[in-house]
Amino acid sequence: MILVIDTSSPSSSVIATIDDDRMAETFSTGRGLDLEQLRHLARTEQITKVAVASGPGSFTGLRAGVSFGLGLAMGLRVPIVPLPTLDLQAARSDEPVTAVADAGRGRFYFLVPGGTVALGEPSGIPTAYPLVGRVANKGAPLVGAGHRFKPETELRRFVEAAAKILETAREVPYGSLEIEYMQTFSASRK
């Protein structure tokens, strides 16, 4: 079983499991991980790989998720795989979308199709594509700036997006896992 942990959002976290015949996901609101659920999974399931959202995202959130995931992978001697947060969001759609993540202070990290990660105010994010992402306040500043979110009913589940990304994602040595924090990420400003 592959365990996927995403704590990149300052307002929620996701724990997903991918097995040969089943996929499951659990969302938690607020900061932090559901440590009881993670401990239960570690005790009762044969974890063969751990994947963690690597940002950009919340400093505290990313550290918690990546630290737990890395410690678990090392303890179980299984591979660790970083999954860029915005790639995970973009993979939820078959159609081109702009992936977004909170960057704090009214700004957002975003990734347009074929582009690189950038940082900007809502008015600086291109409106050519619908948005996908877990953001605070239901994305009110983005909607107020003329953006539209792709409806959840038209998106694949987080766990399905993670499975899609994992098809080509590369495992990294334990000491080489890099986290891309809010405001320290090398995004270009738009």
Describe the residue ranges of each PLM region.
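Alpha-helical context
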Residues: 26-28, 48, 62-66, 158, ...
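DPxDG-like acidic metal-binding loop motif
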Residues: 49-79
